[in-house]
Curated annotation (Swiss-Prot):
Tree of life domain: Bacteria
Gene source species: Paraburkholderia phytofirmans (strain DSM 17436 / LMG 22146 / PsJN) (Burkholderia phytofirmans)
Membrane spanning stretches: 4-24, 52-72, 82-102, 118-138, 159-179
SMART domains on file: G3P_acyltransf (SM01207)
Catalytic activity, as annotated: an acyl phosphate + sn-glycerol 3-phosphate = a 1-acyl-sn-glycero-3-phosphate + phosphate
Keyword Cell inner membrane on entry: yes
GO terms, molecular function: acyl-phosphate glycerol-3-phosphate acyltransferase activity
Signal peptide range in chain numbering: none
Keyword list, A-Z: Cell inner membrane, Cell membrane, Lipid biosynthesis, Lipid metabolism, Membrane, Phospholipid biosynthesis, Phospholipid metabolism, Transferase, Transmembrane, Transmembrane helix
Membrane topology: Multi-pass membrane protein
Name of the protein: Glycerol-3-phosphate acyltransferase
Amino acid sequence: MQNLIVAVVAYLIGSVSFAVIVSAAMGLDDPRSYGSGNPGATNVLRSGNKKAAILTLIGDAFKGWLPVWFVVHYGARYGLDETSVAIASVAVFLGHLYPVFFRFKGGKGVATAAGVLLAINPILGVATLLTWLIVAFFTRYSSLAALAAAVFAPIFDGFLFGPHVIALAIVVMSSLLVWRHRGNIAKLMRGQESRIGDKKKADAAAKPAGGSDV
């Protein structure tokens, strides 16, 4: 019963779309209506409002971090264990990808996954974030950076902690993240992927194929 509650609460937290909320609060267009159509920080950046993009990034990462951190640090007193941490991790991630509050049309999950990993273990989270930053810095492709981070996150986890139940949750999240970027993979192969900082007007024509969004 406890794990069911964890799953529901984490999923509902994940379903809060900060890209949509921040954009509405700041009088910006709905991020689902321009660029890649993805409600994520990278697409919000295409509006030209860096503050909105940063707030979206922080919000999406925080919502991934919050439920997992709570279970990690306070779960034992409620009869929760590592399985509960794994459930919270996947549930909050699924909430971002398929939010009940926004007709199950969510983002790609990179920032939320980063928050989850930081809550599981700060070293794991920082190592994965550095992977994203390095690839993004040299290529300016958010999608390629996300794919690299998704591949290396389970590797970092295995190297640091060995086999454990939470590793399965990390593999599931990484697999879902790669799946959500399948359109980006195709665009990268065609040389048509948009780069970080591209404006929404320049990118609008590419919307049906998916964007390179966090």
